[in-house]
Amino acid sequence: MADLSKKYCVYCLADVTSLRLRCTECQDIELCTDCFSAGAEIGNHRRWHGYQLVDGGRFTLWGPEAEGGWTSREEQLLLDAIEQFGFGNWEDMAAHVGASRTPTEVMEHYVTMYIHGNLGKACIPDSIPNRVTDHTCPTGGPLSPSLTTPLPTLDLTVADQQQLGYMPLRDDYEIEFDQEAETLISGLSVNYDDDDVEVELKEAYVDMYVRKLKERQRRKSLARDYNLVPAFLGKDKKEKEKPAKRKISKEEKELRLKLRPLYQFMSNKEIEDCFENMHKERMLRAKIRELQRYRRNGITKTEESAEYEAARHKREKRKENKNIANSKRGREDGKESEFAAIENLAGFELLSDREKVLCSSLNLSPTRYLTVKTIIIKDHLQKRQGIPSKSRLPSYLDKVLKKRILNFLTESGWISRDAS
């Protein structure tokens, strides 16, 4: 009894269940590939009629000489499986092809037909050129990956390390900043059937985790660069033994405040070196201006500058004494006294001649001058004895008056030049 599930060629009665060509103009005309290629005609069917290829998926690609009887459908599943699971994962590939194929059969068929067969010989060249270039440096060289720069050691005892939870050899803490950051990616997995939205979501999680790691490392670097760990444990006493730093000028303080947003891109040492170099630059500029002044006055040797400065101070002293003598001579000649505005005020008789000139030029009453003088000398003596004091000058004394009085007291020898 004929099998109704099979199809036969109407011309040669060959079995065409796996592959046949059906005429689109004639009814029930199906030919095998041999009869179709020979141009067979039967009944009203002609060779130029349109046709349709009917594939049952059960014909073989490699012909009758192929072992195992692999159908075209199985070949397609095999190629899909090796693309999905990768070469060598024969168990998953066999499960994808079907239960009728074992992992050994899948491996042997793929190696025989696709690698060692004609298809493999045509696609895979006999000699594959080496496209990998070794760029690693020689061992022990200046850029060798085996060389590592050790981190500066921290002066911490075992008890301090346990208290802080710090591991110096690893430069890690038992409790890191943002300790729960790893929970973002701990449950992530890459699946073959993920759509684009799921892939982008997982990439966003990874990007968030990387940013958290960078912030964690930034905070650790700040703690090390600025020596915050010993300061936290009270181990910064050695810093007090270091020589005192130079006095920072007002202009440098303002510049430090302006550049504060840039501190995060530099280490503490780099910042201090930068400002130290700027201070040296200002000192060099001042020295250059001084040397240019000497050159304009005809001085070309360093040892001559001391004599020039001494002579200049003598000239200024003689000029000041001459002005005082002229003022006294004018008063003796009956001219209007320059002290007429203050000579009748209280405390005038307590002032020296130079102090009278100063008060007259500053339009300052003798009592106010004596008050300011007393406060300044008192603060100076307390500072020399190591007693902390805060100067409380009167409100009527502005910066110009204060500077003039300080300079006068310094030149007169009441206070040292450092105090002014």
From Swiss-Prot:
Residues in ZZ-type zinc fingers: 4-59
Main subcellular localisation: nucleus
Keywords: Metal-binding, Nucleus, Transcription, Transcription regulation, Zinc, Zinc-finger
One of the GO BP terms on file: regulation of transcription by RNA polymerase II
SANT domain span: 65-118
Annotated Zn(2+) 2 binding sites: C23, C26, H45, H49
UniProt-recorded Gene Ontology molecular function terms: chromatin binding; transcription coactivator activity; zinc ion binding
Domain of life: Eukaryota
Gene3D superfamilies in the record: 3.30.60.90, Homeodomain-like, Winged helix-like DNA-binding domain superfamily/Winged helix DNA-binding domain
UniProt xrefs under PROSITE patterns: SANT (PS51293), ZF_ZZ_1 (PS01357), ZF_ZZ_2 (PS50135)
Subcellular location: Nucleus
The UniProt record lists the keyword Glycoprotein: no
Residues binding Zn(2+) 1: C9, C12, C32, C35
InterPro entries the record matches: ADA2-like_ZZ (IPR041983), Ada2/TADA2 (IPR016827), Ada2b_C (IPR056267), Homeodomain-like_sf (IPR009057), SANT/Myb (IPR001005), SANT_dom (IPR017884), TADA2A_B-like_dom (IPR055141), WH-like_DNA-bd_sf (IPR036388)
UniProt feature coiled coil, ranges: none
SMART domains the record matches: SANT
Region feature (Disordered): 303-333
Function recorded in the entry: Transcriptional coactivator.
PANTHER family the record matches: TRANSCRIPTIONAL ADAPTER 2-BETA, TRANSCRIPTIONAL ADAPTOR 2 ADA2 -RELATED
Protein name: Transcriptional adapter 2-beta
Organism: Xenopus laevis (African clawed frog)
Gene giving rise to this polypeptide: tada2b
